[in-house]
């Protein structure tokens, strides 16, 4: 863990270390937790619905945050229903439906993930649970 790096990541979100977690909104707490996770320099970072609770500027900051952390030595695994929030930072997709791998492939720049998902799931029953 690097406190200096955490400060750098927090600055991406316009935040500092001197905050009280209990006084923060869900979106603000997520920014703190993501900054902490990045500052640990973990090679695999799992994120479940990371843009949930973020406002529109926060979602842009999140994309900048991910771009800042991308390296050949780090993998981000993002589970989300909000594909528009993250499609510009993805280069690979693993689409799983009820334990079945539907797609596992590199993405071309500019891929519309909603259209990609619809094409991948064509003819399949879409589960909402």
Regions found by a protein language model. Give the residues of each.
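ABC-family P-loop ATPase nucleotide-binding domains
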Residues: 1-26
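Hydrophobic anchor residue at the start of the ABC signature
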Residues: 34
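Helical segment within the ABC ATPase nucleotide-binding domain
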Residues: 60-72
């Amino acid at each position: 863990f690097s406190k200096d790096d955490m400060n750098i990541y927090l600055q991406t979100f316009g935040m500092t270390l001197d905050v009280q977690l209990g006084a923060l909104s869900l979106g603000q707490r997520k920014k703190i937790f993501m900054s902490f996770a990045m500052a640990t320099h973990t090679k695999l970072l799992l994120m479940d619905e990371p843009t949930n609770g973020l406002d529109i500027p926060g979602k842009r900051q999140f994309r900048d945050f991910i771009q800042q952390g991308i390296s050949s030595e780090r993998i981000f695994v993002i589970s989300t229903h909000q594909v528009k929030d993250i499609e510009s930072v993805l280069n690979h997709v693993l689409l799983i439906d009820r334990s079945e791998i539907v797609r596992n492939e590199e993405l071309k720049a500019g891929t519309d993930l909603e259209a990609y998902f619809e094409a991948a799931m064509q003819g399949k029953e879409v589960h909402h649970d």
